[in-house]
Design a protein with these regions (language model features):
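Loop-to-helix entry region at the N-terminal start of transmembrane alpha-helices
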Residues: 295-303, 349-375, 415, 459, ...
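Bilobed "Venus flytrap"/periplasmic-binding protein-like clamshell domains
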Residues: 22-54, 116-186
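Transmembrane alpha-helices
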Residues: 370, 403-436, 462, 466-467, ...
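C-terminal transmembrane helix and the adjacent membrane-cytosol boundary/short C-terminal tail
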Residues: 326, 381-385, 462-495
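Periplasmic-binding protein-like
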Residues: 105-110, 115-122, 201-245
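A ligand-binding cleft/hinge motif common to bilobed small-molecule-binding domains
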Residues: 81-100, 186-214
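Short helix-to-coil transition segments within interhelical loops
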Residues: 384-414, 441
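Cytoplasmic-entry segments and transmembrane alpha-helices of multi-pass inner-membrane transporters
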Residues: 295-296, 301-303, 318-351, 368, ...
Length: 495
């Protein structure tokens, strides 16, 4: 029975790649406003062409989106020519879109023509700080190694990012730290850092009167916006993406970013765009908050339920083995403990390249299952080990088979500890599942990521409050289950 259940759960996960939601076209976006806006424009064009579209917002950086595209987890996402050359193809000499198209075809990927604007990297400072130090260009930073720099984590690791830039300009800055893109702007305005990396079409540059330092050595290449798509994407969908070609210049893109950040609504930016070009967008209407909450919550529940089912079915048997003395026990407890020490984002990144996983809900369920093992395994082992020798001797006198003793006597006696472990694991999983949105698995992490990107507390609470309520509901459910699953004589009574 147990083996059959495991097979069913694993089969559900494998089928899950095709059955989680089932949109005909899945779009991805990086974790910054402009990428969200561009994918929203593409989404509305695709819906106008008759496709059911899911936009997986803020999935991460270049490598995660590129892996997702290659593996078929998404059909398309917005990218930049400089990034394609430097980070994806690692062929900086590829000049034209035509050359890029030929090289990308080797990976089963196509590229649209340019959307019309260049969004290159830049370094920015507050006007007051730049004027105070007399800094106008990047080379001026060499005179001020004491300045505090806050860079996005992707920029710190890129081939066209901080390391090569530092060498090109001969900089020797003493304080360089990694920061989220949106939080970096807050740190800059609060005076916690002096310089940060930015995109030249960021609305926050004009909104906050920031100074863009001149790239006097011409380090940064052109970053012309395009869409990458899988070549097996339906022809009508590709044509819908291409309707965006040549329709966006720098000024229009900056304004779209500004609308999104001011209204906290990417659809509002898309509506303005379609009005400007004389098309009708937003074909399916704005999704209501109620509908979004239902969608996020249902996906979150699915992720938590599947991962917890796996953790229970596999964790309790492992806990039984771990309750016995010997090397196997130490190995099981050590490995489950080690998994718990791996940072959540690192575990997701490690799982993505594994065949049959990739980007999406399957990987999220596997990661959540691994994180959920330790409380269940350890509590099961502890509960069984704590059974007194007298009770064990009495069970032996009854001449029961080992399996019967385990199922009828030992596990019921250990049930309070086991259920406490399952309860702890469930609460942890509900919270950890919010990170699943970073790899396009959806759930209540979507509004949290979007809110962080927009610096909007209300949007963050749209995900945080339901997640907290879900955890409270789970706590209450387990309190009820305790009455049915724990033998009456073992239940704690108030004194």
């Amino acid at each position: 029975m147990k083996a059959r259940l495991i097979v069913v759960l694993i089969g559900t996960l494998l089928v899950g790649r095709a059955s989680f939601g089932g949109p005909s076209i899945v779009l991805g976006s990086k974790k910054f406003t402009e990428s969200f806006v561009l994918s929203e424009l593409a989404k509305q064009n695709l819906e106008g062409a008759g496709f059911d579209v899911e936009h997986r917002q803020g999935m991460g950086g270049t490598i995660i989106l590129w892996e997702a595209l290659q593996q078929g987890s998404i059909a398309a996402y917005p990218e930049y020519t400089g990034t394609i050359r430097e980070e994806i193809l690692k062929r900086p000499m590829a000049a034209s879109i035509g050359e890029l198209r030929k090289q990308l075809a080797e990976y089963g990927v196509g590229v649209t023509e340019e959307l019309g604007f260049n969004n290159t990297y830049a370094l920015v400072m507050t006007r007051a700080r730049a004027n105070q130090l007399g800094i106008q260009k990047i080379s001026d930073l060499a005179k001020h190694p004491e300045l505090r720099l806050g860079m996005t984590h992707e920029f710190l690791g890129r081939h066209d990012g901080w390391g090569p830039l530092e060498k090109r300009y001969g900089l020797h800055m003493s304080d360089v730290r990694g920061l989220d893109h949106t939080l970096g702007y807050l740190a800059l305005l609060n005076g916690e850092i002096d310089v940060k990396d930015a995109y030249t079409t960021d609305a926050k540059i004009g909104q906050n009167d920031l100074i863009v330092l001149a790239d006097d050595l011409k380090f940064f290449p052109q970053y012309r916006a395009v869409f990458l798509f899988r070549l097996d994407t339906p022809y009508r969908a590709i044509q819908a993406l291409r309707r965006l070609e040549g329709t966006l210049d720098e000024a229009r893109m900056v304004h779209l970013n500004e609308i999104a950040e001011r209204t906290k609504d990417y659809s509002a930016a898309a509506d303005w765009y379609f009005e400007q070009i004389g098309q009708v967008g937003n074909f399916n209407g704005h999704e209501s908050l109620q509908h979004r909450l239902i969608r996020w919550t249902v996906r979150h529940l699915i992720l938590v339920s599947l991962s917890m089912a796996l953790a229970i079915v596999i964790g309790i048997p492992l806990g039984i083995y771990a309750s016995k003395e010997g090397l196997a026990s130490e190995i099981i407890l050590t490995l489950t403990g080690l998994i718990q020490t791996v940072p959540s984002l690192a575990l997701l990144a490690l799982l993505v390249p594994i065949p049959f996983l990739g980007i999406g809900p399957v990987t999220a369920v596997v990661a959540l299952f691994l994180y959920g093992l330790l409380p269940i395994v350890r509590n099961t082992a502890t509960g069984l080990r704590d059974i007194s020798p007298q009770i064990r001797d009495a069970a032996s006198v009854l001449a029961l088979k080992p399996r019967t003793r385990l199922l009828k006597i030992f596990l019921p006696l250990a049930s309070p500890a086991i259920l406490a472990g399952i309860k702890t694991s469930t609460i942890i999983t509900i919270g950890s599942a919010t990170l699943a949105a970073l790899i396009g698995a959806g759930g209540l992490g979507e509004p949290i990521i979007s809110g962080l990107n927009l610096n909007d507390g209300t949007t963050i609470l749209e995900g945080a409050i339901p997640a907290a309520l879900m955890a409270i509901a789970a706590q209450g459910l387990f309190s009820i289950l305790d009455r049915f699953l724990i033998p009456r004589g073992l239940r704690l009574r108030p004194t």
